[in-house]
Amino acid sequence: LSRGLGDVYKRQKYNDREGIVIDTRFNGGGRLHEDIEILFSGKKYFTQVVRGREACDMPSRRWNKPSIMLQCEANYSNAHGTPWVYSHQKLGKLVGMPVPGTMTSVSWETLQDPSLVFGIPIIGYQLPDGSYLENTQLEPDIKVANAPETVVQGEDTQLKVAVDELLKEIDGK
């Protein structure tokens, strides 16, 4: 998201839709928590009207409609931190399976053989109460497992539940 969040929002393929599903499943991390928080924390404060026709809602460079986030047990590192921030900032519901508490940042080290690279955890994320996010499992608001027998048939139960829940929220507004 280094090009700026306004640019990211403008390039978002379906930014004219009524809701969005954010899928973090099977993500290995990468410091997205702040960008996701900023992009999805928009609260509508007015609508631009041009000669009697609605042009766009403000803020116009951040998502200001309902959203929901998918997570799973394979999320790692910042893919634990991103849904944690999303949930604790009350941006929307989490759907999927619990995420192990793996939120840290690492220093990447290359050995003499440059094909050997590994990360050493050096940064922890401390909460206001003094505890650390690491080793704190993140529970979803709606716990849903994808069963192997449905996955091999091309069904994504977690995504279906997330879409159904998002549609309920949209219809309730």
Each language-model region and where it sits:
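C-terminal structured "cap/appendage" subdomains that terminate the fold
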Residues: 91-151
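Loop/turn elements at helix/coil->beta-strand transitions in domains of secreted/extracellular proteins
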Residues: 16-20, 64-67, 89-93
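Gly/Ser/Thr-rich loop/hinge elements
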Residues: 7, 14, 27-74, 103-115, ...
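Short, glycine-/small-residue-enriched flexible loop/hinge segments at domain edges that mediate gating
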Residues: 18-28
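Extracytoplasmic/secreted proteins, especially bacterial periplasmic and envelope-associated proteins
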Residues: 10, 31, 35, 77, ...
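Single conserved hydrophobic/aromatic residue that forms the stacking wall/gate
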Residues: 1-9
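Sec-exported extracytoplasmic/periplasmic mature domains
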Residues: 12-16, 37, 41-45, 87-91, ...
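Terminal peptide-recognition signature
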Residues: 22, 67, 86, 130, ...
